[in-house]
């Protein structure tokens, strides 16, 4: 199960990023983190910005409400999504998780 922490009307999600992929998409779970494939290379923050845009589309919020809080230079990241509860996040992630 993907690690989610709810705090002050936001949810913090563990993310495992794979930059330089052929297609940007959510591909499931990896060791308790949401696995995302990103077309952008990990140069000049391009992959981090693409990760936030991808998650904003997934959670149906504006990109300004998605923030990278940890893992700026790592594949393992923590992303905060404002205005989304843990229950709502779990529901939106369900199609991507193989249980």
UniProtKB/Swiss-Prot annotation:
InterPro entries: DUF167, YggU-like_sf. This is UPF0235 protein Cag_0319. Belongs to the UPF0235 family. GO terms for cellular component: cytoplasm. Transmembrane segments: none annotated. HAMAP family: UPF0235 (MF_00634). Pfam families: DUF167. It comes from the Bacteria.
């Amino acid at each position: 199960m993907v690690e989610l922490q709810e705090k002050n009307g936001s949810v913090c999600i563990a993310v495992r990023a794979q930059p330089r992929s052929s297609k940007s998409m959510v591909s499931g779970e990896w060791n308790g983190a949401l696995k995302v494939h990103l077309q952008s290379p990990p140069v000049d923050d391009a992959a981090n910005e693409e990760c936030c845009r991808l998650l904003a589309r997934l959670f149906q919020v504006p990109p300004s409400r998605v923030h990278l809080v940890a893992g700026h230079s790592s594949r393992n990241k923590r992303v905060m999504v404002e205005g989304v509860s843990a229950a709502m996040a779990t529901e939106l992630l369900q199609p991507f998780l193989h249980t």
